[in-house]
């Protein structure tokens, strides 16, 4: 199969994977930032911080969302060091974050040995306006490479700004789910027929995008409920892509 999905702690799972097995790391780690104060950021659950009214239904919580900024930076450095070992020379990394964690995320990715390349923006057209303030309608994507990039391997021209709304209603399967249309553009940084790793896979949107764009996918998700959702979405995408007669899934 062109995808594998692992349920468990990302650091432990990545430790068992071989060197140089992926071309791109594209992931959306817990931001550990929602809330106006440090107390709110470390005491409230992910569901309390991030569930928006357009979700339309209750969504299960996820873990890893209650670190202070120093602890978050330490964890991110650890896991991105391990991810660099798995990434081929010239491979890339894309990490979602918000404005509060932008600095610590760029610090951590460089401390892990990656070459910081820049910041992309994801614009959310339906973000709620705030009276007397600027609308917080962007999240950010830090991108980096494992050493120099050989552009001849993947001669693409990709934009630095992406605009799409978060899925709403019953299409929202995860509290912080990213739009597949954005992820489909981002996975194109991975060479054709390459492999994308997402160690915070959530409901599997990165994997769905990778399969739709002809890339292989390795996903890791700690929460069992979301692992099951991701498995269903990846399997359905694979069947739609290959055709039912070409897809045989092991139990």
Language-model features: locations:
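S-adenosyl-L-methionine-dependent nucleic acid methyltransferase catalytic domains
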Residues: 1-126, 132, 136, 143, ...
């Amino acid at each position: 199969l062109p995808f594998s999905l692992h349920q468990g702690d990302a650091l432990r799972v990545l430790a068992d994977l071989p060197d140089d097995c992926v071309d791109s790391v594209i992931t959306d780690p817990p931001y550990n930032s929602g809330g106006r104060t440090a107390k709110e950021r470390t005491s409230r659950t992910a569901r309390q911080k991030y569930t928006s009214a357009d979700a339309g239904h209750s969504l299960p919580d996820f873990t890893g969302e209650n670190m202070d900024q120093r602890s978050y930076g330490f964890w991110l450095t650890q896991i991105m060091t391990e991810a660099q070992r798995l990434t081929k020379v010239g491979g890339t990394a894309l990490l979602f974050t918000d404005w509060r964690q932008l600095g610590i995320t760029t610090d951590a990715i460089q401390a892990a040995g990656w070459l910081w390349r820049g910041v992309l923006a994801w614009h959310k057209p339906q973000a709620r306006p705030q009276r007397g303030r600027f609308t917080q309608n962007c999240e950010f994507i830090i991108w980096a490479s494992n050493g120099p990039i050989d552009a001849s391997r993947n001669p693409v021209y990709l934009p630095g700004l992406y605009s799409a709304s978060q899925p709403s209603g019953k299409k929202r399967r995860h509290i912080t789910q990213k739009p597949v249309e954005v992820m489909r553009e981002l996975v194109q940084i991975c060479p054709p027929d390459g492999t994308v790793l997402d160690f915070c896979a959530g409901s599997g949107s990165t994997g769905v995008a990778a399969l739709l764009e002809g890339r292989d996918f390795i996903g890791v998700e700690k929460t069992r409920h979301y692992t099951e959702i991701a498995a269903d979405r990846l399997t359905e995408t694979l069947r739609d892509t290959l055709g039912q007669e070409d897809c045989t899934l092991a139990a």
